[in-house]
């Protein structure tokens, strides 16, 4: 029950340094902007008659504010010095917020920091302000899943059926994965493709489109595709120019509900291994 009631935040700076307000050294006193982003709706007046019509809509960048206080005023000097040094302008932070047992993260730029110089005997406080250009909270898990995974089935106690034998593993011969996406807003995934032998022109299909790479692969090659950034790399080298012109990165977006993604190739698809990674996106915490 205490876990569900606890509210905490962990700031991870771009260089890996961390500061937490988890009721150990610092405790959170206020949060603003975490529950929902700002929505913008654009309208234009009707040429005739009353009212307007909607011309556009978007989710704006998110402003976040966190305020915290020292748990034990005896640590004022050390903790204040650490906070003043930790929060720096022009640096990106990953912010992990836990509220009512749910933890999600978001990335933001520090826009302001305040640490009032109050009475030295009272608990020191600070407020940190962030601008999150990508306004949606992300799931902590990236849900990596191999489409062509072999599912092991041996277990204890071991049983060997006299007619059907023993089921040692199950292969996904359909080369398709079906998953239920329960995020609040659509998201894109990243794919890593490897192979056991020669593969020609690998292709991923999902939603209303596909992405096909006009290239050959050999064992040991690693092909990575980022569908949000429209980035394709083979062994770390940019090969975006080898994407089939009929391909559509935007069509590979995952929406709330059931999603299906499959893979194929002109040659060698039986030896392909495709792992999908994605973070679920949420409006708030």
What is each PLM-predicted segment?
Residues 1-43:
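Polar/acidic, low-complexity leader/linker segments enriched in S/T/G and N/D
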Residues 5, 60-64, 91, 104, ...:
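Residues at beta-strand starts and edge strands
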Residues 17-21, 102-106, 209-214, 239-241:
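Surface-exposed loop/edge segments in extracytoplasmic proteins
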Residues 49-74, 122-136, 259:
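Oligomerization/assembly interface segments of phage tail-like spikes and tubes
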Residues 68-72, 99-101, 114, 132-136, ...:
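Beta-strand elements of well-folded, non-transmembrane domains
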Residues 69-113, 260:
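Short, acidic/charged, Gly/Pro-enriched secondary-structure junctions
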Residues 96-139:
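Short beta-strand and beta-hairpin "edge-sheet" elements
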Residues 144-285:
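Intrinsically disordered, low-complexity segments enriched in serine, threonine, and glycine
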